[in-house]
């Protein structure tokens, strides 16, 4: 080999060796693709919840709530055979991942969906909170629910599970600062089987 070729090869080896030594760690991805998963039992996959109409004066203080409105996410075709979860448990269960992709959350209130308007002017000074109906736990938005809110898929369920939730408005300002208008929001639902 000539001197130029040897120098070029030595330079390339040094370049690649430097890249290999420059790492500070590694990321190991672990997961599983399930053969089947629960499906929302509605043709358009949309659950509509009518929260009602309220006077701003009904919210007397910051944190005041409207009446709680129960609703259900009906699921079918859920897998009934258990699998290993992140916590090591082997069971047929899932958690909810609720995302506010369109409007986000109310600033300084990460678990309140920011309201907007589907047709008109949006109200301000309130947000929408979602709770688990059974436990009363606040459902986190844009974050994974904790292990305290896990929905089991019983073997005798034939793959049918109802997720019962509650929604309501919560004021984030004093009544004089609430502006009237539409108080709508969309929250996207993902079932997480970790």
Curated annotation (Swiss-Prot):
Pfam families: Fimbrial
Coarse class of the protein's main subcellular location: other
Induction annotation: Expression is negatively regulated by H-NS and subjected to cAMP receptor protein (CRP)-mediated catabolite repression.
Domain of life: Bacteria
A Gene Ontology term for the protein's cellular component: pilus
Signal peptide, first to last residue: 1-22
Recorded phenotype for the gene knockout or disruption: Deletion of the operon under classical laboratory conditions does not result in any major effect on E.coli capacity to form biofilms compared with the wild-type strain.
Gene Ontology terms describing biological process: cell adhesion; cell adhesion involved in single-species biofilm formation
The UniProt record lists the keyword Disulfide bond: yes
Family: Belongs to the fimbrial protein family.
PANTHER family reported in the protein's UniProt record: FIMBRIAL SUBUNIT (PTHR33420:SF26), FIMBRIAL SUBUNIT ELFA-RELATED (PTHR33420)
Role noted for this protein: Part of the yraHIJK fimbrial operon. Could contribute to adhesion to various surfaces in specific environmental niches. Increases adhesion to eukaryotic T24 bladder epithelial cells in the absence of fim operon.
Name recorded for this polypeptide: Uncharacterized fimbrial-like protein YraH
The species this protein was found in: Escherichia coli (strain K12)
Organism lineage: Bacteria, Pseudomonadati, Pseudomonadota, Gammaproteobacteria, Enterobacterales
């Amino acid at each position: 080999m000539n001197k130029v070729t040897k120098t070029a090869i030595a330079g390339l080896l040094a370049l690649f060796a430097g890249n290999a030594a420059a790492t500070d760690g590694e990321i190991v991805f672990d997961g599983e693709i399930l053969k089947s998963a629960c499906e929302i039992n509605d043709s358009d996959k949309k659950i509509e919840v009518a929260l009602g109409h309220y006077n701003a004066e009904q919210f007397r203080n910051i944190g005041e709530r409207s009446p709680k409105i129960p609703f259900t996410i009906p699921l079918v075709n859920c897998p009934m055979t258990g699998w290993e979860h992140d916590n090591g448990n082997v069971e047929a269960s899932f958690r909810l991942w609720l995302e506010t992709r369109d409007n986000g959350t109310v600033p300084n209130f990460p678990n309140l969906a920011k309201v907007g308007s589907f047709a008109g002017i949006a109200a301000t000074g309130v947000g929408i909170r979602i709770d688990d109906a059974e436990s009363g736990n606040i459902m986190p938005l844009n974050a994974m629910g904790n292990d305290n809110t896990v929905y089991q898929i019983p073997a005798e369920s034939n793959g049918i599970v109802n997720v019962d939730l509650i929604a309501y408005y919560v004021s984030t300002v004093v009544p004089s600062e609430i502006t009237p208008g539409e108080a709508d929001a969309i929250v996207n639902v993902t079932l997480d089987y970790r």
